[in-house]
């Protein structure tokens, strides 16, 4: 068996734990015909003691080059992106270029690229910039959708050998364009690096195409959030790398970037503003080699499994049934790693592309909320972090007879 090696620095990995019967994917849902061959997988969670990165020792999901977004157009997300763009422009205003070219790496259908419209750098007209923005996305269907919306979106993936030749940035307010004729002034990337089996190559691409002193605004999910909340069901194969601020800093500095600013946004996401520097001048941050304690995460897994088992025993004694609302990655993991998979009647989810298919590993049918009228249940467990109260309101408004509404709070199922 080949020795386990870190996907960031190539050093040896140490296994922390194995999570059993995990979904192979958070985005690919089997059809009825595929159930006979589709199954869960065991995921080995490891840590590199050299750079500190916690990662799964597995192949990346087949679609790791594609950006798949849900909820990208919410008012909360729009306000956050606009705030980040304004901050980036405030730093670019210190440079000489008044028409900066800004590239998004991994753009999806342009949900976030479109949010540049109306963003201004400063009320002082002498400092105001005209940002020319463009994006690259691997999945053709998403590129075509973004182009149809009038965005400067191109098919591609940020890796060695990919060229930006022939591309143009677009000033969204005026519709004016500017060709990419040299190096870029800035780049942005939102929650994409954690999917990459070779993050160093992606960052090397960014470094090669930025001007010296150019900026890179980067976000990734925070592994510290999972540790703090002891939430094992937040782990998923799609996120092959689980970055802390320290392990991310180690990686970006190795690629020639200096950290300008960092913060945690939305409680669960790391945001770095980086600057391209001479590699010889970069601070050499190194991990102290401390082993991450995931004991609390494993305790959380056992406690949730026990509470769910106890709850379902009570349900069976009353001759009642349960459904789950939310085919989120958290919901998929809970279903495949607990007794829920044996008792839940079906999963309700509002995403049309999931409906009519089945949950990976647990093989439960995914349906629209209207299915409740054909097959009513006595209670519904909501597993959709961030949307629990909204969904509870929909259940109480639309479903009759109204079932009991439950949610997972910490390590226990509670009625709302």
Predicted features by range, described:
Residues 1-77, 263:
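N-terminal juxtadomain amphipathic helix
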Residues 14, 154, 260, 367, ...:
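General small-molecule cofactor/ligand-binding pocket signal
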Residues 32-37, 231-246:
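Acceptor-substrate binding/catalytic loop of class I
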Residues 42-45, 268-272:
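Short hydrophobic/aromatic beta-strand or adjacent loop that forms the aromatic wall/cage
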Residues 88, 273-416:
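Hydrophobic, well-ordered beta-alpha structural blocks that scaffold small-molecule cofactor pockets
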Residues 88-230, 242-257, 274-276, 332-333, ...:
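Conserved SAM-binding loop
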Residues 261-269, 278:
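Terminal amphipathic helices with adjacent charged low-complexity linkers/tails
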